[in-house]
């Protein structure tokens, strides 16, 4: 289930010779895996393979349960620090009135002030599909109204029945 690679522990380590390091940083040098396992058992710890690719493989004597707990804790911290980008979508049509454009732009500016990304989508109906330039022209008109408050990620582009434009808030 977990995506992390399987770690070899104790008896699972099949190498004849390994480079062994203690939990406290003590270097045991290149010793047999049986000898390293004996040292780990004497200390009440686990023998964990850290670098299987190295010649000879590198193993560390440590408390594996504690090590795994710390790894999971680091992953949770990293996940908390990730920023989720919220994209708000504003749908338009080619035959939209100027007052409606002003209303939608006002909402877009509110979203941008909140730090959200805004995607403008112009839906092309029927014969409007033959001239997507009208949708691009509408998005350019909207861009002139918001360019002081936003950065344009992409030029207006045509996808299926839509002409899209993504804008992001300007950095303060």
Swiss-Prot record:
User: Would you tell me the Gene Ontology cellular component terms?
Assistant: cytosol; membrane
Q: List the protein's name.
A: Translation initiation factor IF-3
Report the coiled-coil segments. none
Subcellular location, principal: cytoplasm
Gene3D superfamilies hit by this protein: Translation initiation factor 3 (IF-3), C-terminal domain, Translation initiation factor 3 (IF-3), N-terminal domain
Q: Which family does it belong to?
A: Belongs to the IF-3 family.
Q: By its UniProt entry, which HAMAP family does this protein fall under?
A: IF_3
Subunit structure, interactors included: Monomer.
A Pfam family that the UniProt record links to this protein: IF3_N
Q: Point out the gene that encodes the protein.
A: infC
Origin organism of this chain? Campylobacter jejuni (strain RM1221)
Q: Where in the cell is it found?
A: Cytoplasm
Signal peptide position in this chain? none
Which GO-annotated molecular functions does the record name?
Answer: ribosome binding; translation initiation factor activity
What exactly does this protein do? IF-3 binds to the 30S ribosomal subunit and shifts the equilibrium between 70S ribosomes and their 50S and 30S subunits in favor of the free subunits, thus enhancing the availability of 30S subunits on which protein synthesis initiation begins.
| Keyword terms | Cytoplasm, Initiation factor, Protein biosynthesis
Q: Which one GO biological process term can you cite for this protein?
A: ribosome disassembly
| Cysteine pairs bridged by disulfides in the record | none
